[in-house]
């Protein structure tokens, strides 16, 4: 059956901001779906609140709305655009829940819109824990013993039936939000309370624990004629009890017999049929008891998921693209497989002749108070994938791709008690402690007994440890061609071999080159080399035949950003994708190097050639040797490729764009100071210190408060504001080992200054400003965590012109070719330069969406020698509307972590709001970030002494909107003196009823809480912020944020929806 002709336009719902449990894999699937449906002639309408996505580029859909993903907003878009159908399976849990809300609130019926890809009933049956269990029993598959509960009494009764440890799973959530494993009654009550809050239907599944069972996933695609194929099987290295998003996973499954695999395959197809997923991709999770082989179904997702992005990258089969086409009526046998150039139909099950390993990336260093033990609630922020011909090779490649300083199984501890603890209670580095256990003399049986990891995986690591021991007992010259090749085939990096031999990495590399030992590159082709493939999707391995077949065209190689993490996220991937697209359009052959399976950059048709490899010097140099590119771009992948810049230049690689020396001039304090002095620009007073005594002496010279940080950081890692010599001493003792042979930087902190971000692009001759963004939060909050407005909402034209002049002067002085980002602080009308980054910044996608100028593309062409004039980019575009970017935080996943913002970045994602006024844009950005302001209730204010004057306007704005105002004693007294009617409310230590009670009783609509720097007032008010977080009450830890929300709330009853195409069209007509 060919495609449906009764549908003309289709609305795709995106996944919104990047949060833990839902990352950029949905940008990848949504972008594929847009392309697939437009290819077939459908009009595609897209809604997604995240500006840092490729799918929200104006070219991806016919009409694009960067608006909050909530049913009320989507209804306005439906009323305006009148789509025939909605495809809700491309945007993760957010899109599914939004689609169900549209159905429940009668919107789909009112406008006669059909759900395609998954019916309301199928979504409900898969996501509703009780219905799912009934469905499984009906087809003879068992689930863990479990009970669906809607009240705490029901939950307690269910727990008695299933016993401890007990698993708690909320309905309709993703990333295991709100769930957990309870080992006693107190834990059980706490997790249930959290779970009821997290579930939109106030429903929990109380389930028997299958801790220690083996976990598997099947990625399945089905069409309307009931053709079903398995894309790939995935096995978890970690047994049940760790969320699959936090587990190391391996594809294809390694420890199933063929018979077991066939049983699981048949079961997964039966699950899809019973749930009613008629078309598209789904993933089904199983647990197998290692004692007797008993198999149970854990859950299924009736949509493309994190696992399907992994399966797509692991096999080369574009699940999201195929699922989108199946949703409009195609069948699998009618679709061709792109990767084989159409030689095979999409109904061929992929077959793979290599092993894929995925390892999650965590960011616990950003949340020291968080519990870093892994359970059923997901905590990782990114992931890395590697391919090899053996499990050992792909595992070790994945470890070095993580960029946590590993180059293999680096030792972590030799203390047997600590090793035992780490094996028994999984944390982010359990696999390293397995290796340590073998080093410390544990037997395979003992290790298996403690951690329940399958003995087959343990045997692989044991073998690697024997190899390590043999290497460290010898010297480099012992490693002849055969010996070194054996190590390389098992995935050992030059750097790890160097550590074992106590020599430099360079010596091992030179020795290997003398032996003429190099990797070859194999192709990912979905068919285990049965058919020839034109698609250059490659991974390295140490074998005989190389399948790279490089061309002799003029090539540019783009180094990607590696795994997502806080401080380096999807924004950098966005820039890499744009570089590849722009340079392809300009006639270059583009080569992408990256190892992040969630991203658009690792899609095989984004660039001409894709190398799925770790971003280490060894791996990059080998690709350069094979491809011999004309130029390499290191400026677009964040800190990851920048760290390689100098070493690449030393090895004769041509880095195009801003030179490595200029990057160093901007990053190196002393050199940068000289640049600013020569230009006559101001910096906050600053000093450099190499040790504690020097720091204390220099701090006295400048005066407190100070911002202290190590040099060369991204995301404000280990950056703090200190107010006294005691705090500085503590910082120097606890945080200073952050960067090797790098001193600590001390800057005078500009209190209550306005921070400003500027992105610009230069071709070496001309400089064009991309956008000037005024931060909402004052200087001292990391720029990645601050809301910002383009154009500025309160900076005078004179100040903006001065900022433009200074930006251009620095771009010329540093010899920038490509993109540059500058952060300024404005205090009492004086402009200070805080820092300059001559590279792509995280605001580039936002600026591009707000102005219609694709900065990353323009910058990439500049690097390749195409001038701004030739590109027709000669003047700054200032929008005639407001665009506001807001950060999204993962605090709800880390109970106990304080929500106070500071100079260390902690947000995982961002949203954008657009409006005719700053207030409207800011309010929509807050909605996009998940903040919901109740239309009634009280506004609670509790601010430090210096903020009291600033909070008067906020109180007046909210009072005018009909809210009551309540405040703690000092703030209430101050506001009353200034003519406001305020109810005084107790702080928690002052006795009951206190603010914690008012929050729990649902009396408070919004919290503004700022604290002075002394630890006592921070800990006294911690409970206010925690209660607000748990009750989902919007809270602001800066007066600026509270004031902006009070302005925004004025326009909440008349919010418009604006498409990117109509906004950009307006700007083009104006110019």
Curated annotation (Swiss-Prot):
Residues 931-1071 are annotated as: Allosteric domain. One of its GO terms (biological process) is L-arginine biosynthetic process. Mn(2+) 2 binds at residues 299, 301. It catalyses: hydrogencarbonate + L-glutamine + 2 ATP + H2O = carbamoyl phosphate + L-glutamate + 2 ADP + phosphate + 2 H(+). Mn(2+) 1 binds at residues 285, 299. Mn(2+) 3 binds at residues 823, 835. Coiled coil: none annotated. Mg(2+) 3 binds at residues 823, 835. Residues 1-403 are annotated as: Carboxyphosphate synthetic domain. It comes from the Bacteria. Residues 549-930 are annotated as: Carbamoyl phosphate synthetic domain. Belongs to the CarB family. This is Carbamoyl phosphate synthase large chain. It comes from Neisseria meningitidis serogroup A / serotype 4A (strain DSM 15465 / Z2491).
